[in-house]
Amino acid sequence: MNTRLTIAVLGGGPAGLIAAETLARAGARVTVYDRMPAVGRKFMLAGRGGLNLTHSEPFEQFIERYGPASDWLAPALRAFPPEALRAWALGLGQDTFVGSSGRVFPVAFRATPLLRAWLVRLGELGVTSRVRHEWLGWTSTGELRFTTPEGEFTTRPDATILAFGGASWPRVGSTGTWVNIVSSVGIEVTPLTPANSGFVVDWSEHFRSRFAGVPLKNVRVSCDGQSVRGEAMITNDGIEGGAIYALGASVRAAMARDGSADLRLDLHPDLTQEVLASRLAKRRKGDSLSTALKRVGLSPVAIALAHEVGAAADASHLKSLPLELLRPTSINRAISTAGGIARSEVDDHFGLRKLPGVFVAGEMLDWEAPTGGYLLQACFSTGVAAAKGAQRFVADESSSPTEPSA
């Protein structure tokens, strides 16, 4: 790539930084713009739980985690798969390991060492950063506009990567304000909604005060024909956790159709209904209902939940406990967002069809995935793909013959 060509990367999260690295390695002069005081804030936030980079499951199973977007994201994920992400981390001195659930983490179990080494590498590649630069859109002549502490700033790069993320972590820069900007130039954006988020339940004060923050372990949750086994967490205003996040799309679809969602919980997935009924029938004389439920292996929070919803203490109810979910919790509390720039608006290299030279990566695109390493992996993979798309664009532009002047 011609080193005189300049690329602007807007957004200093994982998608933006890997795009910057990819482009700098190809010889471009890259500047990363971010509204925060430093880049990498969202990457650091992802590291709070150990930095789940990706997942080790077979690729064909892995790709299905992206639901309707699986075929769309597949080329990017195949070009930069989980193995490539792990090799990239190792190249920065951070080896990875596979946890018992198949999730992949750095051995350090923190984001800080990896981000520190990454920023050093980016500096060595000549990538520069301009922080406290909030994007305002484009000027009438096509320049990028930013507001900064020193005033307004404009620039005209040879290509642009947009990688602002969704709207789920405003305190680290993902505010979703880009939606109005790109919509104003005719780009279709599917509304951003909470994904990997909790849902509101109308708990009684007694249940809320006693069990908010208590995990509901080893349950199976179902909604609209979808079923997931895992763990949930009772919250002050509802329920969240890995099993709930995995059903998010089904729950939101039910809410859009019916106004609320009927979640069903199997409180004892290890026992069939028949076996559970048999054990309940052997209830000892003098046992209270709670004691009987405890004897069949239910936890205190599961027993309280059965009481909370007023379900009869029989096997059929304990295997399919009804819980009405009223709405998603605030988007500010979501781990990620669904929605984004519509698939129809970008080409095979994630370039905007209506704005040649502008490419999109990460959560700005209209896809979603459960927790487990799938979110970060797709951000990295689409960041690499968008960068390579920008490489092709500037190469084509620089090689195009120009008309001789008159």
What kind of feature is each model-predicted range?
Residues 22, 31, 36-45, 59, ...:
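An anion/pyrophosphate-binding glycine-rich loop and adjacent beta-alpha core
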Residues 5-32, 390-391:
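N-terminal Rossmann-like FAD-binding beta1-loop-alpha1 element of flavoenzymes
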Residues 168-181, 185, 366-395:
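A conserved FAD-binding loop/helix module that cradles the flavin
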Residues 8-10, 33, 135, 155-170, ...:
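Short hydrophobic core segments
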Residues 3-5, 149-159, 228-230:
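Core beta-strand elements of the Rossmann-like FAD/NAD(P) dinucleotide-binding domain
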